[in-house]
Amino acid sequence: MRKELLLAASAFVVSVAGSSVAQAQCVLKGTVIDAATNDPLVGVTVSLQGTPTKVFTDNDGKFVIKSPKTKCNLQFSSVGFESTTLASNHAGEYDFGFIPMASASIALKDAVVTTRAVARKTPVALTTLGAIAIEERVGTADLPKVLETTPGVYIMREGGGYGDTKVNMRGFKSENVAVLVNGVSMNDMEWGGVYWSNWAGLTDVASSIQTQRGLGAAKVSTPSVGGSINIVTKTTDARKGGAFTYGLGNDGYNKLAFSLSTGRTADGWALTVMGGKTWGDGYIQGTDFRAWNYFLSVSKELSKNHLLTFTAFGAPQVHNKRSAYDGLTVQGWQEVGKYMRPGEQYRYNATFGYDRYGQVRHSQQNVYHKPQLQLQHLWQIDRTSSLNTVAYLSLGYGGGESGQGTQEYSSAWYGSNNGILATQFRNADGTFAYGKIQEMNAASESGSKMVMSMSKNLHKWVGLVSTYTKEINDRFNLYGGLDLRYYVGTHTNEITDLYDGAYYIDRYRKNVKPENFAGAGTDAFVNKKLSVGDVVQRDYDGFVAQSGVFGQAEYDFNNLTAFVAGSLNNTAQWRKDRFYYDAAHAESEKVNKIGFTVKGGVNYKFPHIDGWGGQHNVFGNIGYISRAPFFSGGVFLASQVSNQVNPDAVNEKIFSGEVGYSYHTAAFTANVNVYHTEWKDKTMAKMTEIPVDGNVERTWINMQGVNSIHEGLEVDLSYKPAKWFSLRGMLSVGNWRWTNNPVGYFYNSAGQPIDKFGHPLDQSQGPDHARMRFNQKDVKEGGSAQLTAGLGFNVYPMEGLRIGLDWKYFSNYYADYAVTANDISLDGVKTFHTPWKVPAYGLVDLSAGYTFQMGGYKTTLSGNIENLLDQEYISQAYDGAGHDWSTANRVFYGFGRQMSVKLKVNF
């Protein structure tokens, strides 16, 4: 944790420095920073060449060293960074200012280097945030919030629960944005998305976050489409120390955290441990949460050429949600204001309520714990080659609540339907009437009409990434490696509460076919009386096995850098069902898909420095990706209930290219890039609600062969004219649109194919399977702001004090289009038009921090105010029939003003 702990100087260093005071002829000082992130580097060894004198940089990266001679050489060294030497010929006191250290290209360092890129050298569009920037910006929000000022990135909080954030990049949704921790993928192996609630604890252990937009430079075998987010956790500290943090904020937000490090011992051992707890009531009504996080890193320098590191981290959590499908219409939000305090109507939660015993009830609780264990071996084979191997294990436990009901009450758990507040079980005060459900079930002579179940998802995931690096000569480097993954996800749905009924009869049991399950179809099977702990609706395992190789050649000479890279992988996918199939028919066929990537790029740094001390830089990259379809909605169209393989599943094809320019001086940096991405044969799902036998049911439309184009311009800049002031800004202009007219097939909420009346069928894509052609060519893609801008500054008016302000602007957000009940038919056609453009909005965030000494310990008091002006704005919406505000549905408003304060004591 180089950037977090206050490191006390050892007695030896103090005595050496003290003994030299009398004879010192010069005092040299400065601040050592990471060349990639501009963050201070803690624990860097600063030594006088030819003498035993050395000191270490403090928590701010600063050092002071005394030399008996005016002419001397200072050497800077730290694990994972290239050593730097500065010559000095100064009498008296001299300040070197900022001294950048670059990450080592071949050295004992973290596994994350296989996915990190270097600014002004790697030919990709990237943004890197260090630990200090993360701490300054995050406040009480989820970790992705700090990326909001990154070009091309759009953050959504969806229903607004803890960790329910979604990240879109260049218009691509979360399942097409790779999220990595220390170079290891976190994306779900079945559908590609990321549940940030599983990784909320990373806020406290992240040393940097790097976003690579577009193709990126990650050396892995399974690439992303929109870009990648690589979170680098803090390494085992070189010096001992610790920190304690307490934070609090609005709506009962509390946070406790601690960190301890033994420092590196004489025999090469080091241990770092961190932990914390976060809890609160939530900004949205009825979204209270409890979360814990832990982090452990143990390293051992086996020799000067071998480093072994074990890392474990996790973030168990319990949080209540507001369903992502329970957004209302604009008018509907005004109407529910009568249930809330003045000005708080947008916090309303349609499924928050009480039972008949006066106890708080929810139908959207999520409980999960997904720890990850990593064992890394770094081997410096010789001066020009190294082998970096990380093996990892991830185990997931938990799930989310899922209301079940008989056919007539199948949709009664919904808080809203197509943006209209559900009233069947609604109290006069607007709360959901859980007590009425209990009363109905208790009076029923045929068991519970509605019960609560838990959709359990148990994951077991093992993998290995190994990268060999070879420096051929001073111009050529070669990389090559293996990327292996094996995953099994067990998905069940177990009854947790009968809601005062005697038993429950699962309506999905009648869909089990006798030819697949011996004994199915009988009255005893279909009408089996179930109780708490029994399985309903689904019970299956999803298997994904990936094996891949990757390679990259780099050329770096004078001012030219170029690379050519490729990867090849095989993805095997199959499922094993215990609900709709007996043991003899349980396992599906195994589907293998080959994917590959070819990409290359060039970066040229102009050799001459202009009159302002600036350097010009240009880059370009181009690539082609063939990616295997996902398990869910791709290989298996009804992945929750059927072993039937999609006969039309094909690889997605992505072509992408971009060019960029940057200008860099000691105080100013500007980056400009334009990109063009063509995406073909995408599989995509849309949710809608249709009437089925007098009830409203949620259904899914799986579309195949969807094509789109994403292109745009991105600009980011930073300016630091003086030590007391820094300025930053960004602009992103996108043009994201659909380019063809695909066909979609309809499935019910259990994943079963349905006919035009909403009744389940035996076979996907059969003659009676309801389908529809989507005429959407040239229609704007929805779900992300296609124009974003930002401007921010930090002011340092006095020693230890920082005040920061950020303005963010979002425009050209088109509502996601949806399909209504009138659209479903056996072979219909739906023509789409440009969806409603949500009103543009701007937000202002304020942050401040003051560092001082308290009882001899370095202490930082910091605070954040998010949405300082309490701006009212729409952050998410779906298009309606009129393509305007009055017909838009599933609308969510963004959070109002949020405040937090934090005290951190380092020791």
Predicted regions and their residues:
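Short, acidic, small-residue-rich periplasmic hinge/interaction motif at the N-terminus
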Residues: 33, 37, 45-49, 75-81, ...
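Surface-exposed extracellular loop regions of Gram-negative outer-membrane beta-barrel proteins
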Residues: 572-579, 590, 604-657, 669, ...
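Short acidic/polar hinge/loop motifs at secondary-structure boundaries
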Residues: 64-66, 166, 185-213, 232
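Acidic/polar loop-and-plug regions of large Gram-negative outer-membrane beta-barrel proteins
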Residues: 299, 307-376, 401-454, 517-530, ...
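Transmembrane beta-barrel wall of Gram-negative outer-membrane proteins
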Residues: 241, 248-279, 284-323, 331, ...
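A beta-strand signature from Gram-negative outer-membrane beta-barrel systems
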Residues: 99, 200-243
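Gram-negative outer-membrane beta-barrel transporters
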Residues: 556-559, 676-678, 697, 701-819, ...
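Conserved C-terminal beta-signal and adjacent last beta-strands/turns
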Residues: 8, 313, 359-360, 603, ...
